[in-house]
Amino acid sequence: MPEIASLQLFKILSDETRLGIVLLLREMGELCVCDLCTALEQSQPKTSRHLAMLRESGLLLDRKQGKWVHYRLSPHIPSWAALVIEQAWLSQQDDVQAIARKLASANCSGSGKAVCI
């Protein structure tokens, strides 16, 4: 995986949906597509397109578990990029944590919901 360039990172994070995905994953560690759709109030196809772009850039990793696909931030993100993400998270920490609290009580992995989008 080639290292992400600064211009590429800022282009990726300039989109509100992609930034939201990255910040939620920074807060919660790992989430499935349906949880991200719920948290961001976006459709599954739109969320999946953004997840694909983030995965292709090397920022995210995914793993399949049955019919669910779970995403997390890659541990191989360059340190400078991780600092950018951390600063973005700090600037929106209260909002991200509020969304995370709501999601934690309703997510498919946290509540044992049998149906995932």
From Swiss-Prot:
Keywords: Arsenical resistance, DNA-binding, Plasmid, Repressor, Transcription, Transcription regulation. Transmembrane segments: none annotated. Residues 1-92 form the HTH arsR-type domain. The gene is arsR. SMART domains: HTH_ARSR. This is Arsenical resistance operon repressor. Binds DNA as a homodimer. Residues 33-52 bind DNA. One of its GO terms (biological process) is response to arsenic-containing substance.
